[in-house]
Amino acid sequence: MKQKIHLWIEEYLFFPKFFQKIISFLLLPLTLIYLIIIFTKRFKAKKIDFDIPIISIGNIIVGGSGKTPITIELASKYENACVILRGYGRSSKGLQIVSLNGDIKVDVTVSGDEAMLLAKSLKKATIIVSENRIEAILKAKELGSKIIFLDDGFSKYSISKFDILLKPKNEPTNNFCLPSGGYREPKSFYKKANIVLQEGKDFKRVITIKKDENIKELPSYTILLTAISKPKRLLEFLPKNIKMISFPDHHNFTKEEILDIQNEYKDYAILTTGKDMVKLKEFNLENLYLMDLSIKIDENVDFSSMNSYINSFK
């Protein structure tokens, strides 16, 4: 039931059917209030310069658009890099140092799934989770970081930064902002970014199936188990006979849920994403496969403005 509700909300926000469009229009007065709040915050914000290059990687629609793999791809190119994110789905509060120069300090319950995936992928970087991005930036500088990558930082108007916005390959047919649609900020705000990268044009996802770090072929009977935003986007990379079991974004799997899935799909292998794998490892599942996602950025993408921004701090 939860899975059906989750998928219905996703459909309503991005690709609504007739009845869902009616709901969308009925909620427009609330959307207007939401927009007034957004514009007021942006107008009142006073930029703070932290004297360190800060690259924000974000999007203006609800849910995932490849921020984590793009962050990994870009941050891996720099020494003394720090990635700062809120840490959705974690049990902890406040600022937590997830990894320090590649040395992982906490477990996934403290860090959240995205932060742990970043920590495991960026072997020399520092990863910090915090609700307060300004506090985290100051901590990163204190720890000796020379460049900061800010996850989902576009709406942090008070931070002076270089903004990269990601566009989905298939843009929503519903162009309204919340709660009438899936945009967190007006679509026109793409023009306010320093660089806009669109999936399918400027970058593409590369999928590799692995088991125990080795490249493998998927068994004939496989289910996709995931707790990411917009899970249907994964299906285009997989055989059509794959069944999908999805949970809300950042969901923490329980032992009971895993046992129920194993009982229902006794002869099936389980395929999952890197973000989910950091949470599923604790269950020691024998027939667990990884849908390893990496990003290939088109060689024609122009990063000269970002390089100039970074060099201006040297």
From Swiss-Prot:
Catalysed reactions listed for this entry: a lipid A disaccharide + ATP = a lipid IVA + ADP + H(+)
InterPro entries: LpxK
EC number: 2.7.1.130
Top class in the EC scheme: transferase
Functional pathway: Glycolipid biosynthesis; lipid IV(A) biosynthesis; lipid IV(A) from (3R)-3-hydroxytetradecanoyl-[acyl-carrier-protein] and UDP-N-acetyl-alpha-D-glucosamine: step 6/6
Binding-site positions, ATP: 61-68
A GO MF term: tetraacyldisaccharide 4'-kinase activity
GO CC terms: plasma membrane
Alphabetized UniProt keyword annotations: ATP-binding, Kinase, Lipid A biosynthesis, Lipid biosynthesis, Lipid metabolism, Nucleotide-binding, Transferase
Record field: transmembrane: none
Family annotation (Pfam families): LpxK
NCBIfam families, A to Z: lpxK, PRK00652.1-5
HAMAP family, per the entry: LpxK
PANTHER family in the record: TETRAACYLDISACCHARIDE 4'-KINASE, TETRAACYLDISACCHARIDE 4'-KINASE, MITOCHONDRIAL-RELATED
Family: Belongs to the LpxK family.
Described purpose of this protein according to its UniProt entry: Transfers the gamma-phosphate of ATP to the 4'-position of a tetraacyldisaccharide 1-phosphate intermediate (termed DS-1-P) to form tetraacyldisaccharide 1,4'-bis-phosphate (lipid IVA).
Official protein name in the record: Tetraacyldisaccharide 4'-kinase
